[in-house]
Amino acid sequence: MLPMITGFMNYGQQTLRAARYIGQGFMITLSHTNRLPVTIQYPYEKLITSERFRGRIHFEFDKCIACEVCVRVCPIDLPVVDWKLETPIRKKRLLNYSIDFGICIFCGNCVEYCPTNCLSMTEEYEFSTYDRHELNYNQIALGRLPISVIDDYTIRTILNSPQIKNG
């Protein structure tokens, strides 16, 4: 009879210990209820990017002097610059400029070292496509300015994001 009583006491202690562990886990879960959500509903909500965000490169054809500094400072020699030497005036004339964003690592060296500031980073980061050859942008595609997330009325922007507060 005595072993049966001690068995019930051990069972009761184990039950209380299990209830305490479950309660501790539940308290941790409840402590997360007053935090802001981490995820956003992507196609309908977008984060406002920071000022120094490195998105798609914008190119101004008229400012470029075809010096090829962007190609020399690029770690992967990515920008393709085609030019022709105009012999009467002894200057280079830019024919074509293209960047393949499927290969680009968005380091920003080309933008930083461009002597004429014809390159700049935009806030556009959506490059989804079914064909990777569509990511090769020529000077016409690079010259288009993207629609700002703030100006697009179909998208709700998220200002109270933990990433923006911390970064």
From Swiss-Prot:
It catalyses: a plastoquinone + NADH + (n+1) H(+)(in) = a plastoquinol + NAD(+) + n H(+)(out); a plastoquinone + NADPH + (n+1) H(+)(in) = a plastoquinol + NADP(+) + n H(+)(out). [4Fe-4S] cluster 1 binds at C64, C67, C70, C114. GO terms for cellular component: chloroplast thylakoid membrane. Its cofactor is [4Fe-4S] cluster. Disulfide bonds: none annotated. Its EC number is 7.1.1.-. Keywords: 4Fe-4S, Chloroplast, Iron, Iron-sulfur, Membrane, Metal-binding, NAD, NADP, Plastid, Plastoquinone, Quinone, Repeat, Thylakoid, Translocase. It comes from the Eukaryota. Residues 55-84, 95-124 form the 4Fe-4S ferredoxin-type domain. GO terms for molecular function: 4 iron, 4 sulfur cluster binding; iron ion binding; NADH dehydrogenase (ubiquinone) activity; quinone binding. One of its GO terms (biological process) is photosynthesis, light reaction. SUPFAM superfamilies: 4Fe-4S ferredoxins. Transmembrane segments: none annotated. [4Fe-4S] cluster 2 binds at C74, C104, C107, C110. Binds 2 [4Fe-4S] clusters per subunit. It is a peripheral membrane protein. It is found in: Plastid, Chloroplast thylakoid membrane. InterPro entries: 4Fe4S_Fe-S-bd, 4Fe4S_Fe_S_CS, NADH_quinone_OxRdtase_chainI, NDHI. HAMAP family: NDH1_NuoI. Belongs to the complex I 23 kDa subunit family. NDH shuttles electrons from NAD(P)H:plastoquinone, via FMN and iron-sulfur (Fe-S) centers, to quinones in the photosynthetic chain and possibly in a chloroplast respiratory chain. The immediate electron acceptor for the enzyme in this species is believed to be plastoquinone. Couples the redox reaction to proton translocation, and thus conserves the redox energy in a proton gradient. This is NAD(P)H-quinone oxidoreductase subunit I, chloroplastic. The lineage of its organism: Eukaryota, Viridiplantae, Streptophyta, Embryophyta, Tracheophyta. The gene is ndhI.
